[in-house]
């Protein structure tokens, strides 16, 4: 499949348009696992992978390396099946954890300089039929926090997919984050990610981009805030206080 994508898609485009960006849905560097299932796939206990509660994170081939693609394109959707994988009381974290696992897997393993353009979607993707009254939509606030963490873990841009009836609400959820992020353009274009941890249970999530001795940080607390958190970045301390709903630029000491 990788050879086919290179020979029939990437190479012809790059010959005609040298230096162009070429990529494809769901094809990206990763940590050896895939943390989501597409709409046409079924979950089987026989799949080789990593079991976590009701979630089975499948082993996934390194198909990106030989495609010749010039950007990575992870899929960060609110797939409805994710909801039942976990028993977290905080409904937002049922979406946040698997999406952050997938996004962080790509960001951590993508070489510096290779853009990451992430497919995103806020509305519940492929909702169950009949509807599950217990399933809670990812809140706009939770989704926007997720987008911030993706930017501060190295995502270069977002590619919004949605059915036509969802256009207005999807753009209203995504655009404010993208617009606000432009204030930190130098960090986004030149900074290097400092954190990729994804808590197993609802707690404190921290992401950041380092530029010299400064770090642009986003901290999101699921549950009660735990006070100041200390990270070690290249042997230096980074103290991250609670800052609900906003970014911070902190100095390494």
Where are these regions (language model features)?
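Glycan-processing catalytic domains of CAZymes
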Residues: 1-253
């Amino acid at each position: 499949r990788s050879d086919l994508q290179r020979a029939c898609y990437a190479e012809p485009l790059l010959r005609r348009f040298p230096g162009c960006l070429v990529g494809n849905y769901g094809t990206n560097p990763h940590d050896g696992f895939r943390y989501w299932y597409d709409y046409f796939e079924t979950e089987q206990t026989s799949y080789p992978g990593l079991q976590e509660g009701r979630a089975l994170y499948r082993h996934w081939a390194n198909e990106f390396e030989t495609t010749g693609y010039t950007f990575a394109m992870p899929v960060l959707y609110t797939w409805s099946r994710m909801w039942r994988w976990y028993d977290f009381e905080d409904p937002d974290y049922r979406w946040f954890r698997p999406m952050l696992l997938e996004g962080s897997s790509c960001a951590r393993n993508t070489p510096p300089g290779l853009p990451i353009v992430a497919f995103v979607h806020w509305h519940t993707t492929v909702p169950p039929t009949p509807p599950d009254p217990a399933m809670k939509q990812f809140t706009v606030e939770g989704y926007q926090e997720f987008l911030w963490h993706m930017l501060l873990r190295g995502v270069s841009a977002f590619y919004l997919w949605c059915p036509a009836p969802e256009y207005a609400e999807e753009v209203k959820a995504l655009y404010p984050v993208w617009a606000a992020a432009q204030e930190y353009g130098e960090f986004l274009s030149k900074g290097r990610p400092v954190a990729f941890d994804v808590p197993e249970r609802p707690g404190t999530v921290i992401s950041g981009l380092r530029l010299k001795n400064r770090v642009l940080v986003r901290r999101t607390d699921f549950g009660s805030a735990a006070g100041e958190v200390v990270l070690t970045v290249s042997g230096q301390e980074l103290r991250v206080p609670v800052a609900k709903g906003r970014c911070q630029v902190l100095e390494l000491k």
